[in-house]
């Protein structure tokens, strides 16, 4: 006799968090609900950008579009944005979240700042 399988219902989530980690080499975006459960994520390296192209604003924009499209089934409307790192993809990723239809409730910079910890990398001289 055939067994009846229950369909797993997708959670309807109204509000969530977006974590943007913008380093000098890559941009990683993670979208979670308010409890911290991951709904979707994307990175510029995972989307096919390689080398120096990973750290461009266009790559960050594409990453944000992909991450938002992956979490469309959850019905996310409002987000709190947490930005970490000094990368160039910070502003373009935040701007893309707004154009993709998400209402940005707050933007927080959570970049860790050392209290005179490790010695920083030497500055580039080109």
Curated annotation (Swiss-Prot):
InterPro entries in the cross-refs: Ribosomal_uS11, Ribosomal_uS11_bac-type, Ribosomal_uS11_CS, Ribosomal_uS11_sf
Domain of life where this protein originates: Bacteria
Q: Which GO terms describe its cellular component?
A: ribonucleoprotein complex; ribosome
Q: Which UniProt keywords apply?
A: Ribonucleoprotein, Ribosomal protein, RNA-binding, rRNA-binding
Instruction: Fetch the Pfam families from UniProt.
Output: Ribosomal_S11 (PF00411)
Entry keyword RNA-binding: yes
GO terms for MF: rRNA binding; structural constituent of ribosome
GO BP annotations listed: translation
Q: Which SUPFAM superfamilies match?
A: Translational machinery components (SSF53137)
The answer to whether UniProt assigns keyword GTP-binding to this entry is: no
Biological role: Located on the platform of the 30S subunit, it bridges several disparate RNA helices of the 16S rRNA. Forms part of the Shine-Dalgarno cleft in the 70S ribosome.
Record family assignment = Belongs to the universal ribosomal protein uS11 family.
**What assembly does the database describe for this protein?**
Part of the 30S ribosomal subunit. Interacts with proteins S7 and S18. Binds to IF-3.
Its name, as the record gives it, is Small ribosomal subunit protein uS11
Write down the species: Treponema denticola (strain ATCC 35405 / DSM 14222 / CIP 103919 / JCM 8153 / KCTC 15104)
Q: What is the lineage of its organism?
A: Bacteria, Pseudomonadati, Spirochaetota, Spirochaetia, Spirochaetales
């Amino acid at each position: 006799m055939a067994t009846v399988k229950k369909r797993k219902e997708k959670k309807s989530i109204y509000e969530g968090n977006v974590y943007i980690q913008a380093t000098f080499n890559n941009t990683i975006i993670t979208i979670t609900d308010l409890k911290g459960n991951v709904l979707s994520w994307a990175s510029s390296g995972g989307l096919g950008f390689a080398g120096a192209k990973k750290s461009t604003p266009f790559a960050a924009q594409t990453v944000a579009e992909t991450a938002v499209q992956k979490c469309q089934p959850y019905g996310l409307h409002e987000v709190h944005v947490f930005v970490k790192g000094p990368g160039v993809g910070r502003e373009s990723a935040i701007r893309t979240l707004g154009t993709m239809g998400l209402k940005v409730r707050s933007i927080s910079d959570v970049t860790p700042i050392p209290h005179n910890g490790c010695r920083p990398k030497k500055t580039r001289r080109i």
